[in-house]
Amino acid sequence: MGHFEDYEHFLTELDRVWTECARVLVGGGRICCVVGDVCIPRKQGGRHYLVPLHSDIQVRARKLGLDCLTPILWHKIANGAMEAQGNGAGFYGKPYQPGGIIKNDIEHILFLRKGGEYRSAPMMQKALSMLTREEMQAWQRSIWTDLRGASTRSGHPAPYPVELAERLIKLFSFAGDTVLDPFAGTGSTSQAAIIAGRNSIANEIEPAYFEIAARSLRKVARRVRFTGAVEARLDVDRGRAMRSAAV
């Protein structure tokens, strides 16, 4: 989608994305959206305030006919410099004034479900998709505190760790399924799909991020592994799409 200054236009463009995702989803399939609310600093907006992006996405998704499910709050280390001017003391504001700023240390993992009954799978496919008791207990909690945010050294302003995508893929798909990522970024979702033994299709319009993702996926596809996809094939379309096939 690129960068938009107009927030309402940005939401309208997101509506187009959710509509297309819903079109290609299987019945009962889920859209997993990792999103942080937007903190506007005083220097930019004249006052510090928050734009509730996660709430707006949920409200508009309902109007598109998608079901909103219980989200997960992901507690991670935020980049304070992108929120407000800190004071070097680990907090914002002054201890003797009531105008302190709460750090935005969470992102929302939203789940939007397409209507219809979810399909059943053959016994072998179910066996390959089995989660452990420990994974079920940890991953189905509504707050995740054990995953650190991904480094921004790649140049992408909002990356997320491959492990986060791997959890979501394993929770909501069968082995051998195809996962679609309309915002590939640096390729975390497709890397996770290979590790989890799923196929993937990823789209990214920013050339710099696309090249980073392609390089990362080539490395992952070459690795020898004994779980997930024991072999992976990568097809890079210069029209800014990537496809990985798990074998």
Predicted regions and their residues:
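Core catalytic lobe of class I
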Residues: 1-212, 246-247
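S-adenosyl-L-methionine
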Residues: 214-247
